[in-house]
């Protein structure tokens, strides 16, 4: 058995390994709403806390946790998340434009995705966490692997 998100007041319940709770209609509506929030944000990432606050449910954080486990939302960096379609697009666009060994700067990412410096930094952090780029020493640039 392992702990999985549930509604026992502590946010967890015991269930056989691999068990996934059935999504209630309320869960599905909340998950669809959260998905829309991240989709509409695009590359201007929304924090998980901010997205959860836009869902009118007391268990919004629990729903977000289940969506993370089900890989319906993806961590970009820290508390910032998006949906797989956006994260896939980030990886694809960067891999198409840059080759191994090339340096990528925050300014280039900012221009490529038409985002703020903060969101460009989150994209670089995400790419580093995915192992696609590595730190070069300068805070504002990474090198393609």
Feature-to-residue mapping (PLM):
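C-terminal non-catalytic scaffold/interaction domains in large multidomain proteins
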Residues: 1-145
